[in-house]
């Protein structure tokens, strides 16, 4: 399944009865080079633990999981949980945290899930939380690098 192919995405979402939510700032990557380039730019390798925020259906998540020692993705939209279970089933180094990243204690999350690895953040950020989230991430001082895609509005 190609998570950047419109037909594959439509079939996947239809199987799970999913419809986009503008209120959640959802936008899914449909050009294959975008998740590949973002994942390459973050410099993840087997010694890296990646925190991803808002994985959506998982195109960036899969690219990260092919490179990193561990990928932890935080997703708020419970409708996407079964979608991610399907798209990430082949990646034992993937963990999904179900909930709101703005309610997470980032240093504790990094210690618990990414301990022993070089912690980085890599994400295609939901536009409705970009500024407050980046503020929290920088203030947490628990990531060695940040690589984010931000929507131009």
Language model: regions and residue ranges:
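Catalytic cores of RNA-modifying enzymes
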Residues: 1-153
């Amino acid at each position: 399944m190609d998570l950047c192919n419109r037909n594959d995405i439509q079939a996947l979402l239809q199987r799970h009865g999913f419809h986009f939510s503008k209120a959640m700032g959802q936008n899914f990557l449909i050009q294959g080079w975008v998740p590949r380039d973002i994942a390459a730019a973050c410099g993840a390798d087997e010694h890296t633990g990646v925190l991803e925020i808002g994985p959506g259906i998982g195109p960036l998540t899969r690219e990260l999981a092919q490179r990193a020692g561990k990928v932890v993705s935080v997703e708020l939209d419970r409708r996407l949980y079964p979608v991610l279970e399907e798209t990430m089933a082949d990646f034992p180094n993937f963990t999904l945290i179900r909930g709101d990243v703005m309610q997470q204690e980032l240093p504790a999350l990094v210690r618990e899930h990414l301990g022993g690895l070089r912690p980085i953040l890599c994400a295609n950020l939901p536009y409705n939380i970009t500024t407050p989230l980046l503020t929290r991430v920088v203030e947490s001082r628990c990531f060695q690098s940040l690589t984010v895609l931000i929507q131009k509005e």
